[in-house]
């Protein structure tokens, strides 16, 4: 048939191109996932736990989180079938999982399946979905509060709903397609840190200095939870590793070390300056303690 002649032969069908990330791109995605809210909330946490003890706690939390992230990377490598090592290759080449498979879309669930079967996969999936949903709601509420401070004519809940509607289409994309947005997120985080440091180093209007509060078991426990939250985001780490080109544990480890080191530096820079400037007056959102045009610019970047 003439129509059949116009159709390409089966061996000439072009394969679907799958976008893969390198080490630098994966590191940027991890930074964008972790940094942000921690820059605004960690100053109060360090103030509640004491400046020296809080700074040490941040470093320890970063090391612990990086170690557990590395464990996840090694666990994911166990769920990926390996091809025969080719002479001259620097590492094994994992076979591509079936794109229609559920585990191809949820590598964390694949780890749970490997460890405990269907029960483990279901438990991991439920925990992952609940965690991501709660974090999403938290970030939307923070964005709504920041926008409400800039435009008080509308409520913070209104801006949270607008943000949810604007971000909803992005959830249909793969991590490999949206890694460029990580650059914008990191740029916003760097701007936010620079704004906080400038506000602390200059005579920008801010709340009066107050003596640091006494460290108690309750305040230290609250600070500990907030600091650990600043290094969270492990739920999507297996998915980020799955989008890497040649996702070996060694390559993923390089992305982890670089990203967590960058997050730690940003957290300490903004937190130490805020505590030294404001003392016990540090609020849950550090930008609420300052005012002026520079602070407004920081609110926009933080949102």
Which stretches of residues belong to each language-model region?
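Membrane-water interface regions at transmembrane-helix termini and the short interhelical loops
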Residues: 43-49, 144-151, 163-185, 243
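Transmembrane helix-loop junctions in multi-pass membrane proteins
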Residues: 38-43, 137-140, 168-177, 278-283
